[in-house]
Amino acid sequence: MKGFKKFFWFIAVSVCFIGLASCAQKSEPTAMAEKASLYDRLGGKDAITAVVDQFVANVAADPRVNAMFAGVDIPHFKQCVVDQICEGTGGPCKYMCRTMKDSHAGLGCTQDNFNAIVEDLVAALNQFNVPQQEQSELLAILGPLQADIVQQ
C-alpha cells in the first residue's frame, strides 16, 4: 500500500509538472488568429479612400457609365463608397447611406454598366498594386450588391 501511495504521488506530481511546463511554452497561434482583416490588408481607411478617389476618377472618365453619375454629389458618393468598403472589409466604419436598391432606383443600370463599373474599380485597385487575393475578397464582398444595382 505504501508503494502505491508513492507511485500515486509520483504520477500526480509528474502530471502537474508536465501541465505547468506545457502552459509555459508559447503556443503557436492558429492561422485564423494571425490573419489580419481585409480592411487591414488593404491598408486601412486612408488606402481605401485613395482607391475610391481613383475609382471615381475612372468612372468619371468612362463614357460607358459617366452619364449615370451626372448630378450626383460626388464627395458624398465617395464617402458612402469608402464607408461601405471599410465596413464590409472589417474596418471600424459604419455605412449610413441609402440602400443599393434605393440608390440605384430609376437609373436603369444594365449588366454592361455594372461590368464597366467593376472594371473601373479593378483598374483603381491595380493602380494601387492591391494584391489579387485582396481584390478577389473585396469583389466577393461587393458582388452580391449586383442584384440591387442592375435593373435591366
Name what the model sees in each region:
Residues I18-S22:
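C-terminal motif of bacterial Sec signal peptides marking the signal peptidase cleavage site
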Residues M1-I11:
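Bacterial N-terminal signal peptides that target proteins for export
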Residues A24-Q152:
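Core of compact, soluble alpha-helical bundle domains
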Residues S14-V15:
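Repetitive helical segments and hydrophobic/amphipathic motifs
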